[in-house]
């Protein structure tokens, strides 16, 4: 994203989520190891807002917590989210469309900057991240509350369901001995759930209804934002990857958390 901002020349690097200023669009052309003509700049008139703070655009977790949660918090704090264009890493997926509509953002006003290398905006605003700390593993409680309020009006309602979130529908990190896990859990009353085909509203309702959630590490646990306080979370990790991301999200909501490797 490039904008003159009245000749002050500001660059937003979408790969590293950093602001670089004052440098010009041609900085990248001149400094490249093998200089080559840059793709044309896409001009955007009026007031725009860039709604992105890092992560993978197509990933459910990053979309919910790096795009939607900051907008929801800003709106709840009285900031008018009313712009001519919304610059997003938008790929028209079902959950992206549903969440934008829930926020009252018209899809016709959304501009996916994934389609352009360079955007020149007359006036552009940025929204701050609501995650902080090392690797963004800590969450703003007000932001989580604003996110919950979009789909869970009564946030303290408790649930009784026991669920296991399967990754059978995932492209990566499948659980090799999942049938063995299910043979242990199902007699205890656990239901195996695939979330990919569910709407955000359905996923939020599901997590609110749970007493215990067992799940391999993955984006589906972004829905812990909708879990009832005192829900028990058991996260399963592979031996080569452990993170405190969902442990901190669970604690922010008020859930009990345990991990197994």
Where are these regions (language model features)?
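The feature primarily captures lumenal catalytic ectodomains
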Residues: 1-261
